[in-house]
């Protein structure tokens, strides 16, 4: 049963020196530490799923480039096209650019937009973005692959789709009452 109290991350506070992102993170240990979207997303996914904060429940996510995470299905995580709290948003680049991007879903708004937490290789240490459905693209050149679900937060798209539809219905109902 998922914990009902997801704690979103909207600032970098608590990241520097945190073992999820540093000493216990395979990207950091391989020389690809922060700022780096894969290092950040891997660490945040683990931080979200490690309910006892004892560094157990180590993820089996890909340790390759961001655009490879979606196809790394041997990790055993459910995947889908519906956003979920704590899920990894997977994007691939176009044919002539970079290595994709991964981010973590921190909030799902009633209108379907999501807020993601991010880091960028050679760029920003930490930042958030608000992205719109249906493809949740932060910039031109990216292609939406989908979401990898964190099992601690429900584990599958069906659960999250029901929650999202309920929130959407409630938001619509509130708007009707206001008018």
Give the role of each language-model region:
Residues 1-120:
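Secreted/periplasmic proteins that engage bacterial cell-wall peptidoglycan
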């Amino acid at each position: 049963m998922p914990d009902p109290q997801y704690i979103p991350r909207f600032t970098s506070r608590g990241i520097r020196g945190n073992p999820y992102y540093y000493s216990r993170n395979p990207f950091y240990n391989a020389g690809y530490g922060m700022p780096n979207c894969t290092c950040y997303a891997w660490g945040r996914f683990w931080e979200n799923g490690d309910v006892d904060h004892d560094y157990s429940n180590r993820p089996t996510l890909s340790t390759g480039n961001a655009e490879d995470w979606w196809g790394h299905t041997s990790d055993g995580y459910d995947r889908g096209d519906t956003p979920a709290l704590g899920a990894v948003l997977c994007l691939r680049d176009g044919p002539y650019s970079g290595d994709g991007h991964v981010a973590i879903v921190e909030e799902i708004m009633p209108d379907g937009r999501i807020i993601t937490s991010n880091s960028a290789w050679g760029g920003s240490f930490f930042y958030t973005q608000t992205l719109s459905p249906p493809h949740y693209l932060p910039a031109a050149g990216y292609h939406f692959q989908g979401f990898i679900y964190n099992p601690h937060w429900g584990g599958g798209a069906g659960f999250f789709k029901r929650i999202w539809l309920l929130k959407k219905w409630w938001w619509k109902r509130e708007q009707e009452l206001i008018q």
